[in-house]
Structure formats: C-alpha cells, structure tokens
Amino acid sequence: MSEALTPRQIVEKLDQFIVGQKEAKKAVAIALRNRYRRSLLDEKLRDEVVPKNILMIGPTGVGKTEIARRLAKLVGAPFVKVEATKFTEVGYVGRDVESMVRDLVETSVRLVKERKMNEVKDRAEQQANKRLVELLVPGKQKQTMKNPLELLFGGAQTSQQDTYQTYEDDHIEQKRRQVAWQLANGQLEDEMVTIEVEEQQPMFFDFLQGAGIEQMGMNMQDALSSLIPKRRKKRKLKVREARKVLTNEEAQKLIDMDEVTQEAIRLAEQSGIIFIDEIDKIARSGQAASSADVSREGVQRDILPIVEGSTVMTKYGPVKTDHILFIAAGAFHMAKPSDLIPELQGRFPIRVELTKLSVDDFVKILVEPDNALIKQYKALLATEGINLEFSDDAIRKIAEVAFEVNQTTDNIGARRLHTIMEKLLEDLLFEAPDITLDEVVITPQYVEQKLGNIVKNKDLSEFIL
C-alpha cells in the first residue's frame, strides 16, 4: 500500500478489521498522512517536522493494539509492540528501553530483506533448478593423473580416455536437458534428492539476555558466529521442498546485505512505529510515593530521550529516533494520564479515548470485519463438509452474552467473544467429523442451552467464560 492514502481511505481500510473507535482511527490516519506530507517538504524543513505521538486511553480488548498493527501493515512499515512494564531502569537487571529501537530495526531488516528476496525470486529459482538438475544427474568426476610421467608416456591411452570422456559428457548433458524439461513441467516434484544445507547453530548465549549484554547494542551470538565455522549437513527432501531451500539460498547470494541494512535503517527511522502498551502501569498511582513509584519514574525518564529523539546504537549501526511514531496505550484504571511525568506527557500531544464495546459493537465484530469470528468458524467447519449458519437473533444473543459477562466479571472487550464462541461450538467442533448433516443452524435457543446456565452463575462465568 502507498503512504499516499488519504486519511479517509486509511480509516476505511481500518474499518475492514476494527469496529468503531472512529476517534482513534482518525488520529492515526492523520499521523500517517502527515508522514507523507513531510516527505514532500524540502530537506531543511523536513528535519524540523516531527511526528505527533499518540496516547490511546481505553480498556483492554477494544482495538488499541490492532489499530496500530493494521496501520503499519497498511503501508508496509516496521512495527513493534512492547510492554512498558518489561523495562527496568539503566543499571538494573532486565530489558533496557533502547531494546525497543533495536527490535524495530530487526523487524525493518527482515521486511527489507524479504522484499529484496522477492525481487530476485525468479532468478534465484532458475539457479535452484540448475542445481537440482546437477543433483539429479551428477556429473562424472574427472580422474586426476597420479604420476606426472603419464603425460609423456601415456599419450595414446590419454587420447582414448579423452574420447570416452567426451562421449560421457555428451550423454550426461543430454540427460540433464531431459531432466530440466521434466522439472519445468512439474513431473519430478515427488522425487527424492539429497542436498547440503547449513546447520542451525544452537543459541549458546540466550541465558545471558537481559543481564546487561543487550545494552551493548549487539547480539553476542552474531558477534561470535563469524569465528565459528558454519557446518553443513545432508538432507533428503522431495524436489518441491528442496527447490524452496535452494531458492532461498540463491536469493540470499543475489542480495547485497549492506544495501539491505542501509535501507532498513532508513525505513525504521522514517516509517517505524513503536507501540508502547501498559504505559499506565509505570505512572504514579496518585497515592503516597513508594520505592515502586520511584522505579517506575526511572523507566519513564529512560523512555523520554528515545521519544524526544536520540541516537541508539544497534548492531546494524546508529539509528535516530527523531521521526519514529510512538503510540502509547493504557487502560488508566488506577492512574490518570496526568500521573505520568510532565515531560513524557508533553511528548504525547494527541490523546484519544477508546470507548467500551456495546452489544451493537459485539454484533458488528462477529460479522463485519474481514477476519470476523463467525467467518472463521464457518470456514473451519466447511472443511468437514458442514455448512454452519447463524440466525440474526442468535448472533444478537451471543453479543448480549459477551456484553453481560464483561459487565459482571472483568471487562476484556472483544477477546471475550473468543471464549464464548469456543464454548458455544465446543460440542459441534468435537463431533463434526462424525456428523452426517450438511447444514447446522445456530439459533437463540441453542445459544441459551449452551451458555445460559453459565452466564447466570457468576462463579461459573469467572472460571469458564
């Protein structure tokens, strides 16, 4: 997707996956469009225009993360989601806040590398097919002369060998042409072939993560990988699987990793989106100050320079955070946005409040999005030859149950529907392979039968739904 989408078009695209929350969609659409507008400015002014970071306020399960994730996917921007509670102050054991930028760059490198490999895929597949032909019809190894004197006294014999060798080479070449034709026509897809692949090195240093090594801006495994020789092992695969492995190897040879790295850093700096969840958990609770509050404030102060704009060292090189879009989110049940330190509040000038989901919202979530739950379950049961249908009243009943359980127990938003739908269709999903019916219709009576008693019993609701 192009970044030249208008705010209205962006909102329409988000509407395909997320129900309601117009204000939040509007805010992120404007932020994305501003990036496009900034790219059209002259270089001097472009550096001065920084993104307006967004603070989303709303309960869990109303679409905060999904809005940011879908936005990034819409324009092919690198996106990472981090939880503020996972970070610790500099000097303490745990993840330092700069790791979010390193994660973003890793994501960006992966995106760019994937795109570059897709660009050379056709050439790589041609090379892979050539290698497959050579593996399926191996050439005869030429014999080397053991004694140099044979050059002087073995002339006639050598001439005969050369003639025979030429005949053999022609025969192999002819056979390879035949195999290449069969490969091109998909006639050898199930043939077995032995290939050599790089053996995955075990991650020796995973246990050290978070113990200060991350602050070095590099992964020790990568640092030592150049010292440890890469081992190769033989694998026997079907031709169709071997082609994928060989195509991947050939594509990696065709791309320039230095170019990938430079483009990835530029993409992360100019288009990256970092979503900081649970930011309310590191705000002061408004009660008397405690050591926990001091620690939380330390994390806020560590986040501040990254959000303001600084340079973070990564294993790919220095990365500037000045133009990365930060979207922070939190429920703010126990704390208020004003409980964040003033400097950090000022770095999130756009605030949007996401509303709790109503019964009507639940109805829309069940049927409208492209990835709606009902569409998913219908597709799953269609694989068993069963046409699953829901009456409008049944959908309404499911939405009412979800809303009621959210009201009487913890409000987990749209995630409640996953639990309810799984419980509702549990027996059907279990019995599906043995059912002889072609069509099953879910009615309000069926919903009441499966969920009614559980909803009425608060204790059961807390444990089951």
From Swiss-Prot:
It holds the Pfam family AAA_2. Disulfide bonds: none annotated. InterPro entries: AAA+_ATPase, ATP-dep_Clp_protease_ClpX, ATPase_AAA_core, Clp_ATPase_C, HslU, P-loop_NTPase. It is found in: Cytoplasm. GO terms for biological process: protein unfolding; proteolysis involved in protein catabolic process. Its main location: cytoplasm. One of its GO terms (cellular component) is HslUV protease complex. Keywords: ATP-binding, Chaperone, Cytoplasm, Nucleotide-binding, Stress response. One of its GO terms (molecular function) is ATP hydrolysis activity. ATP binds at V19, G61, V62, G63, K64, T65, E66, D277, E343, R415. It comes from the Bacteria. A double ring-shaped homohexamer of HslV is capped on each side by a ring-shaped HslU homohexamer. The assembly of the HslU/HslV complex is dependent on binding of ATP. Belongs to the ClpX chaperone family. HslU subfamily. ATPase subunit of a proteasome-like degradation complex; this subunit has chaperone activity. The binding of ATP and its subsequent hydrolysis by HslU are essential for unfolding of protein substrates subsequently hydrolyzed by HslV. HslU recognizes the N-terminal part of its protein substrates and unfolds these before they are guided to HslV for hydrolysis. HAMAP family: HslU (MF_00249). This is ATP-dependent protease ATPase subunit HslU.
